[in-house]
Amino acid sequence: MASSRREFLIVSGGTLAASALNLAHPSALRANPLGRPIGLELYTVNAELDKDYEGTLKKVAEVGYTEIEAGVSTKRAAADAKKAFDTAGLKCHSLHIGMGGIEEAIPYAKEVGAKYVISSVTFPVPPKPGPDGKIDMKALFAQLSSFTLDDYKLIAARCNDMGKKAKDAGLQFGYHNHNFEFKPQSGGAYGYDIILKNTNPSLVTFELDCGWMAAAGHDPAEYLTKYSNRYSLLHIKDFHPTDAPSTGLSPDDRPKPAELGRGHIDYKPIFAAAKKANIEYYYVEQEPPFTTTPALEAIKIDYDYLHAMV
């Protein structure tokens, strides 16, 4: 807010616009851990969006969120999504893409105004659906857990390729982690480190999913410090504690999700490192299932928790 006050003395027009935003979203006046708006990854409210797209976006904005990370939708044209975002007062700076290539995501990202295109999960070779047109998720989870160091080198090469295509289109490609990249490999190496070291920094940035990294037994603050120039975005989520690190995504392997502050992850050192790394955007993302607290209630708990940290 100090910056906004300085701008008040210089650009009155900008102040009027900011004032209008703050009246629409009073909670935007509150401090937050990184000194910039708290975003929401729309995956968190996927089920609600399927039932009422525009109404759910409005409820997201009513909580106080002003920024979102969306996904490429096969159900809604990019122009329609952009109109719905604008109507709700939400800015989409980042777009998640599926397990295939980046080609379909580039025009979608440009239409909705996104700067980043982030690969949710990257395979050495994109998986193909079965005869029924569906992906066998059980087989997919098993494949993720069986990746070798050579597979991760192929993943890095794919990231560089997608990064080049994004850059040529005026966008920035990024890699998003889960927990499986931290399954120990031969010689004590980790797939995630292979991807970091074998991708071109000018083509590939990283979105650090702090929750998944912590669930795998690794320290997001340590990575943000060691590779501070590689990160542009964060996913903020929490999990209930487990007896051992989790490095699998199958229902039996993954930890139980929790609202922020109700799990085991200490975000204070993570945000301290993120400030030094000049993170541009950060998004609350809570994993399903929402067995005790509905998603729209959970995102308010998450939002209020982050503001209370300051």
Regions found by a protein language model. Name each.
Residues 40, 60, 68, 85, ...:
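Conserved, mostly hydrophobic/aromatic
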Residues 168-264, 271:
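Acidic/histidine-rich catalytic cores of soluble enzymes
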Residues 36-41, 68-70, 92-95, 117-119, ...:
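Hydrophobic faces of well-ordered beta-strands that scaffold small-molecule active sites
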Residues 14, 67, 93-205, 296:
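Active-site acidic/histidine proton-transfer and metal-coordination neighborhood
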Residues 23-50, 55-59:
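C-terminal segment of N-terminal export signals and the immediately downstream linker at the start
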Residues 32-33, 57-62, 76-92, 103-114, ...:
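Acidic (Asp/Glu)-rich catalytic clusters
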